[in-house]
Amino acid sequence: ALVVKGLGIGFFEAAAEGGEEAAKEIGGIEVIYTGPAATTAEAQIEVINSLIAQKVDAIAISANDRDALVPIGKKAMDRGITVISWDSGIGEDGRVMNLDPSNTALIGSSNIKWMKNSMGDEGEFAILSATSQATNQNAWIEEMKKEFAKPEYSKMKWVDTVYGDDLFDKSYQEALGLFKKYPNLKGIISPTSVGIVAAAKAVEDQGLVGKVYVTGLGLPSEMKAHVKNGSAKQFGIWNPIDLGYSAVYLSYQ
C-alpha cells in the first residue's frame, strides 16, 4: 500500500503512477493507493490500521508526523508487514527504511537561493509550509536557516513561517494573512506543491504580481501559468513518478 499525506494532491497522484509502473514490472502485486482526507497523523493512523486489518504485505508511508506514526509502524511490523517511509520520513523505530526524495541540504539551500534570485537581495520574505509536524518540510526549513545565515542574505529578512497543512484553501488564507501582516513582503517560499500554487494564486488575486514573488517546490504542470504571468520566477521539484516507483520497489524487496 502506498499511503500519502492526503488525497487529491497532484504530487502524490504522480507518485502513484510510478508505483503502478513498478507493480507492472514486478508482476503479481497490487498497489493500493490511499491516504486520509485530512492531512493529519491521526487520520493517517486510521488509514494504516485499516491496512493492517486487510493484512497487506507492505506499507510505504509519506508521513504527516515523524514521531506520531512510530507506534502504528511498529504495530504493522509486529504483524509481519514491511513498513518503509518515503518522501517524508517516520522515526527509525517505526519503519525498516526511509527513502528521501533528494539531498536535504540541497533542497534547503536552493529554496533560499531561488528566493534571492526572485525578489532581489533585500526585503522581507516568509515561509508557507505544509503541516508543522511534516518531517521533510521541517528538515528543509532547518537547511534553509543554515543557508540564510550566509552574508549574501544579510539584507533579506525572514519575517515568519506559517503552515497551510497541505490544504489549498488554508494555504491560500495563510498567504493572504502574510500580505496583511507584512505590507512590505516581497517573497514567499513554499516547499510544498499545494502551498506554492495557493500562494501564487493569492499573489495574482491581490494584484501583487511584480511586488511579491513566490518560489519553492511545485509541479511544472501546476505552475506553468504562474511562471508565465510573473507571480513565480523559478521553483524546483524532483520527479514524483520516480519516487513512487522506487517506493514500491523498495517495499517489494
Task: Give a label for each model feature.
Residues 1-253:
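A residue-level marker of the well-folded mature domains of exported/periplasmic proteins
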